[in-house]
Amino acid sequence: IGREAIVGAGLQGPFGGPWPYDALSPFDMPYGPALPAMSCGAGSFGPSSGFAPAAAYGGGLAVTSSSPISPTGLSVTSENTIEGVVAVTGQLPFLGAVVTDGIFPTVGAGDVWYGCGDGAVGIVAETPFASTSVNPAYGYGGAIGGGVPYNSYGPIGYGGCGYNALY
């Protein structure tokens, strides 16, 4: 879920800066003080992707799944009027068919690119995440509580998610 679905389009973290979330992998590199190799990608000062791919800034995408017996599939629905050049990026796992429905003007094109390999099946056309920047971690202090440290780790709080010493 992009930050737009949580706080609205174009808004950043609770205190103005992008949230320090590393969308690459939770185990990719050490930059958290508690468990350096398992810092959940949100260490004291870690790479920040801004929580969403660059193409997700148009708002949240509704995802629904339903079945009369049990959930057996995923349906992604977006009912928008789109004008101009459009690029949709990301990876959507699927087995079976992909359907694009709607009116395509006589000028332009509508395509679905997909592929599979190494056990992964999904839509594979992607763009890079937003530019990486360095931002402080979550945690109480500084802006909340008048600078009172959280878990005795200073005014910006404990590196990572702030859950005791686990991460």
From Swiss-Prot:
Residues 1-55 are annotated as: Left arm. It comes from the Eukaryota. Keywords: Repeat. Residues 127-167 are annotated as: Right arm. Residues 56-126 are annotated as: Central domain. InterPro entries: Chorion. GO terms for molecular function: structural constituent of egg chorion. This protein is one of many from the eggshell of the silk moth. This is Chorion class CB protein PC404.
